[in-house]
Amino acid sequence: ATAPITIIEFTDLQCPYCARFALETWPALRARYVDTGKVRFASRDLPLPFHAHALPAAVAARCAGEQGKFFEYREALFRGQARLAEAPYDAIAARFGLDAERFAACRANPAVAQSVREDAAIAKANGIASTPSFVIGREVEGQFVGEIVSGAQPLETFVERIEAALAQP
């Protein structure tokens, strides 16, 4: 079954407000809406130009995702955000039991970084320039229609917007 509402997140793994959302708001949001099938959550990357470690971190998280550990890996990056300059990617991968060779090959693949840049281009084309930003909406006649929520808003803001979207016919 597909969820009636989709939230598309645009995040930067070096952004402190993105970390706040991921560590404080996301667990409750996931439990209440994603795990219950009411909302589909898609994470997209928007590495900001002044965050030198955001692109390599995004690539590493995607590569962890190829082995089924995206959200766990992302949480570890957010928790260790102050140490991103040390490029802890392989150590975190080992902690989650990822295949090191596969992980390294993925990180070295230029197509992965290109897909991160494509997410950023989509954000820009839709007027999204800050992180975290979210688009909460649904598909209507083949088009995604939604509203943008900017910043690490409290859970209540998401609940209000999601419930309003769910109430629409």
What are these regions (language model features)?
Residues 10, 90-169:
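C-terminal cap of thioredoxin/glutaredoxin-like
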Residues 3, 8-94, 99, 104, ...:
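Structural alpha/beta surface segment adjacent to cysteine/selenocysteine redox centers
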